[in-house]
C-alpha cells in the first residue's frame, strides 16, 4: 500500500502514550480519552501477559509506573489489573479496552514491543482484523513486522530504528524495506 502525503501518519501530531501529564497518567484509558477528545491519533505500546492477554504499557518492567519490580510479561492479567498506575485508580488497560474506547474515532499507531513470546503478533493481527478504525503497526523487531505483513498484507506497517550504525547490521530483507512503508509518495 502506497501512502500519500496527506496520510494521517504524516500530517497530524500523534499523542505518544495518550495525552498525559499532571493528573493524567500515561498509557491509561484517561490519557487515551483525552487524546481522542482533542482529535489526536494515539500511539500505544503492546505487551503480552503470562496468560496471553494483550495490554497497553510502555515499559517492559512495571516498576516505574506501579512500584512492582517485575517484567510485565511475567504477570497475569489479573495481577496487572490489581496494580494501580502511579497510585491512582487507573489500571493497565487491555488492547480490547482501548479499541472499545477509541472505536475508530481517531487513528492508532500501534507498537508491538519486543518480548519473549512472539505469539503477540498473531493475537494482535487477529484482534485488529476485526477493528473498524484506522491504524498502523510498528515495531523495532523486523521479524514481527514481517509476520504481520504475512498475516495481513493490507495492514500499514513500519519498522522502527534508532541509529544508522545499527542499520548496517540488519538482515538483508530488512535493509530492502526499512524506509518504504512510512515514506509518503512524492
Residue spans for each PLM region:
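Phosphate-group recognition and catalysis centered on beta-loop-alpha active-site segments
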Residues: 1-186
Amino acid at each position: 500500500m502506497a501512502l500519500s502525503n496527506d496520510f494521517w501518519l504524516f500530517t497530524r501530531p500523534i499523542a505518544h502514550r495518550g495525552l498525559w501529564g499532571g493528573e493524567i497518567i500515561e498509557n491509561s484509558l484517561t490519557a487515551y480519552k483525552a487524546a481522542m477528545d482533542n482529535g489526536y491519533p494515539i500511539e500505544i505500546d503492546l505487551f503480552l501477559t503470562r496468560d496471553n492477554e494483550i495490554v497497553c504499557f510502555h515499559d517492559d518492567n512495571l516498576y516505574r509506573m506501579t512500584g512492582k519490580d517485575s517484567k510485565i510479561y511475567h504477570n497475569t492479567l489479573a495481577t496487572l489489573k490489581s496494580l494501580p498506575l502511579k497510585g491512582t485508580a487507573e489500571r493497565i488497560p487491555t488492547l480490547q479496552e482501548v479499541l472499545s474506547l477509541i472505536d475508530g474515532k481517531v487513528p492508532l499507531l500501534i507498537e508491538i514491543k519486543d518480548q519473549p513470546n512472539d505469539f503477540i503478533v498473531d493475537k494482535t493481527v487477529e484482534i485488529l482484523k476485526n477493528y473498524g478504525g484506522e491504524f498502523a503497526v510498528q515495531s523495532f523487531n523486523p521479524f514481527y513486522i514481517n509476520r504481520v505483513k504475512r498475516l495481513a498484507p493490507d495492514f500499514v506497517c513500519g519498522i522502527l530504528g534508532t541509529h544508522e550504525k545499527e542499520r548496517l547490521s540488519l538482515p538483508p530483507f530488512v535493509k530492502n524495506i526499512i524506509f518504504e512503508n512510512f515514506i509518503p509518495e512524492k
